[in-house]
Amino acid sequence: MYVILVYDIVTDEEGKKILPKVFKICKKYLTHIQHSVFEGNISMPKITALKNELKQFIRKDVDSVILFSSRNERWLKKEFIGLIDDKSSRFI
């Protein structure tokens, strides 16, 4: 399954401690493409593991994680405006 993950962590005192942990978890499973955005092909068991790890740190009242998924990345159109990073320019 192809996944795009986007997170938003409030950067209060606790958030500053959570942010690097969330980043590290996401990077373990997906490719970092822009600030708090990750993408990649991942199996369902790994998606479950990713979500379970993130739930340990995400504060439901202030932080958020959004997962967009598709069976295959070729069903998505990716269009760039501005700087194109090599990590995310593999396809359009």
Locations of the language-model features?
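Unusually extended, aromatic-enriched hydrophobic runs near protein termini
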Residues: I4, C26, L50, L83-I92
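C-terminal structural segments of small proteins and small subunits
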Residues: F57-I92
